[in-house]
């Protein structure tokens, strides 16, 4: 096989034209884009997302239907702060949401009420960044998609304790009551509404319009109607009645109190059902006024429907009215007031648009399951649905149909960001609509406007609580680009409306055959969430209905269709009953299968079939895995458990100072970096005009039309982040890889850094590895490292910590940031500026002051010494205490940045603020004027000599008449905020340009407005800070961490270990040419772990290093043994990678050859510096008086129960007594012991430990009284 070269890598894939990967962030970006539909004009917006929320809640009317508030359109203004500002100031990156609302009056009495159209502010909404995240309170967050049960109908089966199979059908709506139909052990079918009261299914049928037994039996075609005559009935003697013979008569009753006569309908049963016709019965029937009777058919299929007859027997009702009353009583536990209210209950439950909604998905699933043809727009239940479900259940009972598999992906769908936001906005707008209605009712006679009615806080409070507290709104894992992209593509079965960890069984967590190409079978967390949190596969997309789809090529008559039409995305349901061939099945040049038998998949089987039987073919063997799993070369040679660890650990790799892309990759590394949006990418073709370490400037190519309609400069400036802190305290530090004068193309990556090199993912380093023990130091997966790794910064990373100190207003006065701190030496404050903030560049050691702050002390009587100090130094000296922020015991680093945010000083005179604000107004008004002049120039040029087709505003008032010439004067008079951008002229091209110019003008105008608002706020209010906080200081400290003993490292195959020893270069084992190896791994870690991929990688990468080439070996379609042998032979290396090594200490050759190669190793985020902790004295728990636990609390170790047992076993009673009392929580005893030690006195008798007091109080709380003697 001849390998192909792409992107500087030699690719071993057998498929030469695989499908291009879809955008990896499409899940997030498309969903949010579809939710807002900002690029779509209002009249063309689909009824989905935000538009649908407005459509569902508007128009709003008051209770008398006098006033109507109608929704016309919504739009958003530019954000107040940039993403960078939000991150550094701890703010939310949001945009103001505004709606154009129209208020009018329908009541002729209110003639003076004019129709009002206003833009109403509905609150700020968090806005997604270009990389699919949200910035909430200064931290990047991700909304994880949720995998939940699809709305629709589900048929299930359970086993009763006596062995009877019970069947059920459950209808799950998008919103509204659940209804379940189930059989019981007596072969009777019941309906359960909201899992509460049960009623026979025939009662429900009567209540929805199938009143008589005849109507019910006719649904299933079960009864034969016989006209009542003596001759007819005589013929039928011996046959059983299928329905009751009833006699209906009117009974007049007089009310005892009022004497009023009330007519009551009475029903008497003449002959019950299931009774044989006899001479006596015939007489009774003839005497009643019945016209026809129903008899059992003689057909054979009636036995299948015995459940209906059994249910009719249990049914207490005989008419629709009785059934409605029965349902009402069951649900409400009360008697209905009248027939209408009884009917209303059942109508509201399932047949009302307001209360019940199956959603697009629910209707689609029910139609598909029951082969119905009901209009997709009907989102409520219909009688037809209920009848078909009952029929299907009867088929189930008779073993003529099968139950649903709840874990099948056709029964589970994905709630993406857009849908979750739609639900939240739905809640917020519904609340807002209520308050609007209340305000309308209150302000009946006043003149009011939409702004008076709407309360903007309602929506933003719901949305903010969703982003801040919802389980699916998660703090983004930002350790490296892979961690980011994986987090955004994650699917969780947990969260509101999903499963809970405790209730989820094995089946839900297990891999299902429908996961193929949709959900990754490998990447999932270890631990309690296993199988509940999964990742999307590389080619998977989410359909409009929320089902996960995967692409296949169509195969017709044994020939694969490689055209664009032949490629289709299939949901799990569409893939059912299809035979799918593997992606790397051998084909000839015409796309026909070479072999007579083809390996294929058919649902959960793997048959060998003839080419003609194949329906579809995988697009690529990579399609089965997620991004992280697809990054592991030779994945096919690894055990699944280790592959799982490998894909999870790559997400924990810290970005290195000098990263290197792997010699052996899988070909997906470049695509990942591009789609992660972490690097700066050229938007289109252009030329680099300026480059330095902090910014890149590019002049983009523009067409004449683009140049004309744009108000932007052609040169775009990109600023590069330098040592920016991530959520996980790793760093993003980008540097340019383009030069001045370079031509760039659209999509070209212009920078590297943050775990990338040359536009490819670079999580670690390629190191020379030997699989051999080294003096026992690599026992139990430990790793022996060459000192060169430390010296040459192979695994050095930079970590940035942020330290914050807030200045508050306290009851005793204002706190203050200062370097003048009481009782602190000058030496300790030498690096602080006048605000008490440490200078940039200062080296920090444990205990150093980072931010100096003083706080007013409590007013208690001063001691004589304090009185003297106050007399000498004035009032200031004694009334403040040191409240500075000091470096923690393990903090060592360099200050790289400091920030100080302050609210505007109150002392500023009002006049100076007014002056500044009016100057700002002038400056920005001038900018708006210039922008408007440029707009008029452009429009005048466009419309020169053109006849106008009419220019209208939102109220359809004609501002420029049709047929007139467009003059500059006319154009200057237009307000572009209220005009409709419909066709102004007869020329389509001109109209397009006019629209583009106007849209660009409005965008710039709004940006200028937002900037002005922002500047005014800065002048009047200062920085936005939470309530009660006057100032906030931030210090950023960078720590350079070299690899050291105790750090965790791993390869890509789940081969993890802890560095146990760093050995001098000359002591490491070396190759025959004198090259010392970089790392020694224990060979015993390979056989039991069954991750042989690492050996393949090591051998191939060694050849790659020797030949100075890089390889791509895609998973399940990578390098074969022959390919590897070819490259090892070219490089002059042993085919099996085994070679003799020499002892660094003695120079002797080792007895056996060892496997040597080059492996890609990562340094993980579990570093010993973060874990190392020791305490002598520190904080105690208030209640038990014992030391706190954990590094974060600076806690200590406790002498626990098992340690006490050890001392007891040795009989060390005095030591034990000391440990449990004076050395622990005997508060009085320990201070006395301290005194005794200081004075040299004998130790006092121990007292009562505090923990015993706690126990005594607990017992007293239980009502037990006792005393200690």
UniProtKB/Swiss-Prot annotation:
Read off the PROSITE patterns from this record: RNA_POL_BETA
Q: Which InterPro entries match?
A: DNA-dir_RNA_pol_bsu_ext_1_sf (IPR042107), DNA-dir_RNA_pol_bsu_external_1 (IPR019462), DNA-dir_RNA_pol_su2 (IPR015712), DNA-dir_RNAP_su2_dom (IPR007120), DNA-dir_RNAP_su2_hyb_sf (IPR037033), RNA_pol_bsu_bac (IPR010243), RNA_pol_bsu_CS (IPR007121), RNA_pol_bsu_protrusion (IPR007644)
Q: For this protein, what is any one GO molecular function term? A: DNA-directed RNA polymerase activity
Enumerate the Gene3D superfamilies for this protein: 2.40.50.100, 2.40.50.150, 3.90.1100.10, DNA-directed RNA polymerase, beta subunit, external 1 domain (2.30.150.10), DNA-directed RNA polymerase, subunit 2, domain 6 (2.40.270.10), RNA polymerase alpha subunit dimerisation domain (3.90.1800.10)
What cellular component GO annotations does this protein have? DNA-directed RNA polymerase complex
> Which reactions are catalysed by this chain?
RNA(n) + a ribonucleoside 5'-triphosphate = RNA(n+1) + diphosphate
| Chain ranges passing through the membrane | none
Q: Which PANTHER family match?
A: DNA-DIRECTED RNA POLYMERASE I SUBUNIT 2
Question: Which family does the UniProt entry place this protein in?
Answer: Belongs to the RNA polymerase beta chain family.
Q: Which NCBIfam families match?
A: PRK00405.1 (NF001616), rpoB (TIGR02013)
What name appears for this protein in its UniProt entry? Answer: DNA-directed RNA polymerase subunit beta
Q: Which organism is it from?
A: Porphyromonas gingivalis (strain ATCC 33277 / DSM 20709 / CIP 103683 / JCM 12257 / NCTC 11834 / 2561)
């Amino acid at each position: 096989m001849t390998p192909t070269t792409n992107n500087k890598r030699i690719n071993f894939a057998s498929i030469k034209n695989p499908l291009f990967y879809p955008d990896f962030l499409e899940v997030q970006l498309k969903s949010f884009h579809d939710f807002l539909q900002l690029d779509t004009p209002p009249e063309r917006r689909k009824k989905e997302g935000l538009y649908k929320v407005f459509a569902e809640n508007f128009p709003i009317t008051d209770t008398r239907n006098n006033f109507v508030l109608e929704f016309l359109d919504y739009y958003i203004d530019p954000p107040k702060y940039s993403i960078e500002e939000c991150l550094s100031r701890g703010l939310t990156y949001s945009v103001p949401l505004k709606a154009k609302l129209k208020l009018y009056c329908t009541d002729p009495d209110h003639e003076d009420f004019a129709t009002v159209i206003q833009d109403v502010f509905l609150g700020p909404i968090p806005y997604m960044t270009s990389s699919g995240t949200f910035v909430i309170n200064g931290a990047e967050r991700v909304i994880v998609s949720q995998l939940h049960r699809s709305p629709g109908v589900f048929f299930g089966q359970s086993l009763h304790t006596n062995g009877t199979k019970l069947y059920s059908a459950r209808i799950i709506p998008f919103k509204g009551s659940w209804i379940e139909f189930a059989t019981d052990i007596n072969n009777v079918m019941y309906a359960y509404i909201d899992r509460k009261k049960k009623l026979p299914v025939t009662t429900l049928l009567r209540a929805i319009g199938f009143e008589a037994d005849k109507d019910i039996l006719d649904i299933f075609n079960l009864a034969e109607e016989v006209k009542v005559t003596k001759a007819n009935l005589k013929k039928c003697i011996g046959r059983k009645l299928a329905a009751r013979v009833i006699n209906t008569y009117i009974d007049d009753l007089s009310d005892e109190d009022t004497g009023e006569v009330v007519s009551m309908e009475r029903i008497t049963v003449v002959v019950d059902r299931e009774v044989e016709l006899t001479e006596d019965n015939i007489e009774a029937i003839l005497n009643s006024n019945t016209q026809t009777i129903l008899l059992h058919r003689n057909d054979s299929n009636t036995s299948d429907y015995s459940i209906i007859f059994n249910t009719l027997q249990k049914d207490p009702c005989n008419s629709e009215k009785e059934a409605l009353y029965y349902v009402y009583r069951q649900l409400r536990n009360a008697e209905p007031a009248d027939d209408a209210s009884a009917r209303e209950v059942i109508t509201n439950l399932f047949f009302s648009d307001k209360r019940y909604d199956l959603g697009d998905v629910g209707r689609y699933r029910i139609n598909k399951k029951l082969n119905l043809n009901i209009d997709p727009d009907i989102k409520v239940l219909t009688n037809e649905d209920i009848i078909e479900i009952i029929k299907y259940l009867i088929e189930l009972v008779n073993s003529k149909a099968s139950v649903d598999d709840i874990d099948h992906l056709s029964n589970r769908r994905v709630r993406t960001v857009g849908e979750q936001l739609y639900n939240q906005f739905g809640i917020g707008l519904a609340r807002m609509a209520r308050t609007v209605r209340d305000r309308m009712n209150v302000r009946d006679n006043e003149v009011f406007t939409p702004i008076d009615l709407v309360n903007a806080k309602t929506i933003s409070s719901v949305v903010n609580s969703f982003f801040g507290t919802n389980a699916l709104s998660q703090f983004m894992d930002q350790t490296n680009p892979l961690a980011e992209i994986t987090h955004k593509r994650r699917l969780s079965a947990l969260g509101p409306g999903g499963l809970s960890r405790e209730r989820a069984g094995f089946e839900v967590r297990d891999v299902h055959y429908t996961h193929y190409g949709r959900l990754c079978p490998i990447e999932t967390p270890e631990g309690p969430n296993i199988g509940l949190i999964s990742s999307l596969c590389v080619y998977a997309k989410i359909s409009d209905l929320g089902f996960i789809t995967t692409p296949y090529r169509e195969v017709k008559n044994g020939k694969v269709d490689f055209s664009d039409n032949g490629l289709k995305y299939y949901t799990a349901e569409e893939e059912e009953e299809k035979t799918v061939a593997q992606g790397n099945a051998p084909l000839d040049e015409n796309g026909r299968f070479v072999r007579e038998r083809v390996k294929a998949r058919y649902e959960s089987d793997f048959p060998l079939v003839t080419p003609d039987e194949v329906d579809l073919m995988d697009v690529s063997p990579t399609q089965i895995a997620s991004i992280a799993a697809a990054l592991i070369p030779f994945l096919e040679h690894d055990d699944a458990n280790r592959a799982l660890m490998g894909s999870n650990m790559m997400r924990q790799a810290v970005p290195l100072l000098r990263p290197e892309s792997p010699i052996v990759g899988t070909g997906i590394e470049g695509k990942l970096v591009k789609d992660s949006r972490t690097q700066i990418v050229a938007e289109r073709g252009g030329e680099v005009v300026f480059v330095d370490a902090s910014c890149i400037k590019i002049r983009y190519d523009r067409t004449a039309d683009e140049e004309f309609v744009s108000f932007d400069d052609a040169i775009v400036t990109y600023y590069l982040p330098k040592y920016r802190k991530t959520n996980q305290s790793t760093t993003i530090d980008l540097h340019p890889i383009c030069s001045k004068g370079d031509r760039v193309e659209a999509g070209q990556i212009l920078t590297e850094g943050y775990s990338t090199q040359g536009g490819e993912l670079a999580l670690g380093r390629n190191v020379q590895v030997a699989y051999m023990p080294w003096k026992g130091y690599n026992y139990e997966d430990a790793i022996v490292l060459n000192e060169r790794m430390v010296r040459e910064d192979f695994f050095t990373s930079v970590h940035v910590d942020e330290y914050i100190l807030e200045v508050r207003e306290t009851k005793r006065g204002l706190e203050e940031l200062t370097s003048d701190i009481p009782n602190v030496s000058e030496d300790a404050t030498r690096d602080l500026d006048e605000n008490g903030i440490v200078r940039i560049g200062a080296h920090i050691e444990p205990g150093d002051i980072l931010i100096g702050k003083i706080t007013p002390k409590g007013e208690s009587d001063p001691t004589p010494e304090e009185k003297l100090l106050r007399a000498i130094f004035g009032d200031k000296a004694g009334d403040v205490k040191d409240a500075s922020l000091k470096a923690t015991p393990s903090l060592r680093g360099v200050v790289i940045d400091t920030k100080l945010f302050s609210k505007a000083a109150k002392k500023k005179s009002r006049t100076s603020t007014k002056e500044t604000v009016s100057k700002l107004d002038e400056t920005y008004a001038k900018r708006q004027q210039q922008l408007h002049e440029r707009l008029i120039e452009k429009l005048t040029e466009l419309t020169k000599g053109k006849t106008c087709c009419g220019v209208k505003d939102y109220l359809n008032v004609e501002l420029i008449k049709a047929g007139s010439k467009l003059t500059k004067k006319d154009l200057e008079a237009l307000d572009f905020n209220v005009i409709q951008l419909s066709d102004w002229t007869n020329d389509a091209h001109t109209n397009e340009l006019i629209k583009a110019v106007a849209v660009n003008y409005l965008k710039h105008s709004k940006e200028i407005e937002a900037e002005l608002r922002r500047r005014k706020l800065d002048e009047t209010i200062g920085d936005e800070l939470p309530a009660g906080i006057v100032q906030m200081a931030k210090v950023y400290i960078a720590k350079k961490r070299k690899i050291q003993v105790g750090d965790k490292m791993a390869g890509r195959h789940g081969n993890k270990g802890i560095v146990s020893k760093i050995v001098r270069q000359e002591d490491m084992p070396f190759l025959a040419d004198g090259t010392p190896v970089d790392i020694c791994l224990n060979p015993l870690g390979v056989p039991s772990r069954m991750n042989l991929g690492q050996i393949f990688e090591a051998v191939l990468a060694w050849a790659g290093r020797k030949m100075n080439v890089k390889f791509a070996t895609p998973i399940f379609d990578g390098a074969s043994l022959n390919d590897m042998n070819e490259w090892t032979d070219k490089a002059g290396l042993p085919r099996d990678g085994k070679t003799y090594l020499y002892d660094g200490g003695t120079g002797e050759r080792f007895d056996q050859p060892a496997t040597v190669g080059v492996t890609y190793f990562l340094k993980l985020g579990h570093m010993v510096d973060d874990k190392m902790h020791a305490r002598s004295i520190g904080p105690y728990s208030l209640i038990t008086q014992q030391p706190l636990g954990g590094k974060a609390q600076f806690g200590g170790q406790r002498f626990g129960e098992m340690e006490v047992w050890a001392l007891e076993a040795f009989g060390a009673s005095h030591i034990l007594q000391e440990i449990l009392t004076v050395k622990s929580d005997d508060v009085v005893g320990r201070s006395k012991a301290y005194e005794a030690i200081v004075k040299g006195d004998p130790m006092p008798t121990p007292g009562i430990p505090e923990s015993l007091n706690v126990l005594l109080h607990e017992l007293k709380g239980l009502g037990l009284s006792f005393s200690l003697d």
